[in-house]
């Protein structure tokens, strides 16, 4: 019996030591990779901002980030002229979205609220569907060049004006709701008088969100 107890203590001690070594190794890996990962994420975010803004001549200056209506705004200027806004929005905090995972988008709008472009910053969707999300809506027959205030940013199955990803209506609904969420962030912001024609915040009943 004493030998059995001794073996049990040795086994417990060994497991404890293994756990401590593993924890220390994980902590070391985290410390080594934390800064490179953060730098890569920042670079991806900055690249996405430039990708979704209007194509204009001159040096684009990005103003300090602003929070609005649950999204992050990056207003862009050439000199003193405001040319558009890149908006970072995600499914996080949206309990009513019919979507099991989470994703983050960077959506670009021009001065009147038309969608210029978008980039997927992060997504936890099924790999095939996630890849489709990055390109599916990038055509003028889909959402580019359109304004959520004048176009129903819902899938056609729900009576909207946007074609859903094939066999993935739920993901398409969630994607479009995030785009409308991004638009509502800029709709609450002051805009030049000549650029206010599309700056009307949407409600669930008005089209963009279901």
Give the ranges of each region predicted by the language model.
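Flexible, solvent-exposed loop/hinge segments and secondary-structure transition points
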Residues: 2-210
